[in-house]
Every structure is written in C-alpha cells, then in structure tokens.
C-alpha cells in the first residue's frame, strides 16, 4: 500500500508508556522491530493517565536503551513537551546525543503539553496561546543549537549565552509537531519535518480541517506534501476475541475525556475517576475495535486516503505481545500487499 502521493506507507508501534514498566515496554519495542514494523514511539509523561497500575518512564532514558537493543526502527517521542518542565536547550542536547547513538533513527516529536505532566513538578500550566508561543520559540532555539557553533538567544521565554551543543549527529534529527487543531497544524506545515495527530475523531476533521491546514503551512514555507511525514496514531483494539477487543479499551478511557479535561486535569486519580464514569461504548468510540483483519484494513484505508503517510498503531490491551503477533500476521499483509 502506498499513500495518495506515491510514498511508501510506514507502519509503526506506539509503546504504551502509561501502562507498562520500562523493561517490559522495551521488550515490546524489540518485538515490533522483529515483526517488521518501521518505527517505535513513546510518550513522555511525568504522570500516567491512571494512578492505579499506571507507569510513566522517562522517554529520555528509555529511547537510548531501546536504540541499543534494536538496529533498524525509527525511535521517536509522541510526544514530548520541550517548553515547561524541560528547558528546550536540554532537549536539544539530549536528542542530538540520541541522533549520534542511533544515526538516522531518532525523531523528536513535540507538543504543547498537558497539566498532568507539568503541575506536579511546580510548573504553572499556561493558557493555550502561551503554550503555543513557547513551542514556536523552543523550536527556533533547538534548531539554532543544532546548526550553529555558538548560540546567544534572547527570547520571550528562553535565553542562551554562548551555548554550544558539542555532540551533533551528521544527519539532523527531524522535528515532528503534534497538533489536534488547525492553528498548530498549520505551524507544523511551516516549521516541522513531520506532523502527528491521533485517530478516532471523525474523518471530516482530518480531511476538511487538519490536513488542509497542514497544506497551508507547507505552501507558506514553499514546500509540498511530499516533503513532510504525515503521521497518525491509530487507536486499534484488535483481538481474535471480539469481547476482549472491546474490554481492552477500558484502561485507556481517559483518552475519551474532553480535550479541556485532558489538558487541564493535573491529578491521575481525578483523571481516572472521570474516565471510569464513561460507558464502555463511549470509550470504544476512539478506537477501531475489531476481530476481523479485513475490517481493520478497510478502516485504516480511510486515513491513507485522507493523506497520511505514517500509521502508528496503539493497542490498549495488557497482552501486547499477542497484539503484535496477531497484527503482524493478519493485518500487516493487508496493508502491505
């Protein structure tokens, strides 16, 4: 299968960092490479969506560990916030190092953040306008550190004085910008090497709002769609047992809360309480829930037809090894005939 612009379709695996301990999560990443997938992605939460049975390993530590255990897959954050609890200069240094250790494989996926991960460490969580402004400034700062020898930077939020990132990879680390609305999506088209969004919000959002906004940004920067990787995290609960496929979505009920709740609630205990009030039918709406490989492939095709070039699959169940085995055997051949 190729995308609508003739590019080979990439298939990736989203490591469920809020659900599994880091060692087990790394084993799943290794299996994803062994099963022939192209990329592995991890979020960078300080706190999980759920307090009970939740996990939140550091992406900055986990990614180099997985890089050492794999040899081929691209490794990225989906996503990391480089603007609040981190100084963007530290992120520039960390991902330059990762790019040296895993040449051509590292991806810095970034977003504007969630209160869940910032408030707990004493960081004031700003309004959307400021978070977006911080993100734009951080990208400028990171790119300067990656391209210039000595950087003095005077911004509204960040400052550098004679700063140098001494270890930089020969192949620059691409920056992917995550967005769920047209404003930041347009910015991704102007400034990003890639774009990230998530599935399950109605196909019209992607075909009529987000991807057109991305194209506007690309046109403003003098680029074409073929010059940006259009990535979507596809929420897929696939299991041979239909009842199990449905039940597996329950752990990830917080994803079905409103955007305002997900961005503003700072306590995993409260997040889980709100999520557990949702009926399973509402939770499952964010997911492709199926035991039929053909049905899955047909649902996924809609995102390819819309214009996405990189499909990253996030499975909600506890048995991730089972998912990877079944998905690779039954679904991938339909996506890569």
Curated annotation (Swiss-Prot):
Classification via Gene3D superfamilies: Luciferase-like domain
BP term (GO), one: carbohydrate metabolic process
GO molecular function, one term: glucose-6-phosphate dehydrogenase (coenzyme F420) activity
EC number(s) on file: 1.1.98.2
InterPro entries hit by this protein: F420-dep_G6P_DH, F420-G6PD/mer, F420_G6P_DH-rel, Luciferase-like_dom, Luciferase-like_sf
Binding site for substrate: 198, 201, 262, 286
Catalytic activity, reaction form: oxidized coenzyme F420-(gamma-L-Glu)(n) + D-glucose 6-phosphate + H(+) = 6-phospho-D-glucono-1,5-lactone + reduced coenzyme F420-(gamma-L-Glu)(n)
Pfam families: Bac_luciferase
Membrane-crossing residue ranges in chain numbering: none
Binding residue positions for coenzyme F420-(gamma-Glu)n: 44, 81, 112-113, 117, 180-181, 183-184
Keywords: Carbohydrate metabolism, Oxidoreductase
Enzyme class: oxidoreductase
SUPFAM superfamilies the UniProt entry points to: Bacterial luciferase-like (SSF51679)
Family from the record: Belongs to the F420-dependent glucose-6-phosphate dehydrogenase family.
Function: Catalyzes the coenzyme F420-dependent oxidation of glucose 6-phosphate (G6P) to 6-phosphogluconolactone.
Name under which the protein is recorded: F420-dependent glucose-6-phosphate dehydrogenase
Gene this protein is translated from: fgd
């Amino acid at each position: 299968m190729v995308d609508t612009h003739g590019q080979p379709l990439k298939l990736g695996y989203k490591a469920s960092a809020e659900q599994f301990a880091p060692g087990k999560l790394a084993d799943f990443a290794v299996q994803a490479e062994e099963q022939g997938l192209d990329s592995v992605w991890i979020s960078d939460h300080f706190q999980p969506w759920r307090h009970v049975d939740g996990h939140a390993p550091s992406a900055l530590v986990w990614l180099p560990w997985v890089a050492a255990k794999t040899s081929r897959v691209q490794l990225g954050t989906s996503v990391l916030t480089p603007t609040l609890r981190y100084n963007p200069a530290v992120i520039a240094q960390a991902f330059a190092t990762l790019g040296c250790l895993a040449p051509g494989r590292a991806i810095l996926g970034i977003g504007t953040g969630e209160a869940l991960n910032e408030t707990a460490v004493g960081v004031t969580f700003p309004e959307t306008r400021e978070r977006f402004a911080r993100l734009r400034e951080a990208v400028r700062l990171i790119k300067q550190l990656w391209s210039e020898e000595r950087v003095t930077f005077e911004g509204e939020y960040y400052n550098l004085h004679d700063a140098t990132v001494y270890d930089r990879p020969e192949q620059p680390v691409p920056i992917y910008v995550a967005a769920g609305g047209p404003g930041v999506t347009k910015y991704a088209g102007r400034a990003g090497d890639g774009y990230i969004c998530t599935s399950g919000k109605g196909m019209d959002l992607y075909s009529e709002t987000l991807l057109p906004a991305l194209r506007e940004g690309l046109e403003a920067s003098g680029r074409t769609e073929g010059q940006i990787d259009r990535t979507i995290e596809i929420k897929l609960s696939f299991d041979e047992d239909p009842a199990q496929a449905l039940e597996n979505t329950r752990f990830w009920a917080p994803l079905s809360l409103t955007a305002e709740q997900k961005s503003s609630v700072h306590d995993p205990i409260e997040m889980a309480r709100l999520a557990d009030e949702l009926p399973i039918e509402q939770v499952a709406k964010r997911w492709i829930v199926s035991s039929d490989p053909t049905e899955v492939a047909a649902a996924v095709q809609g995102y390819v037809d819309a214009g996405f070039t990189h499909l990253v699959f996030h499975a909600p169940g506890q048995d991730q090894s089972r998912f990877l085995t079944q998905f690779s055997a039954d679904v991938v051949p339909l996506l890569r005939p």
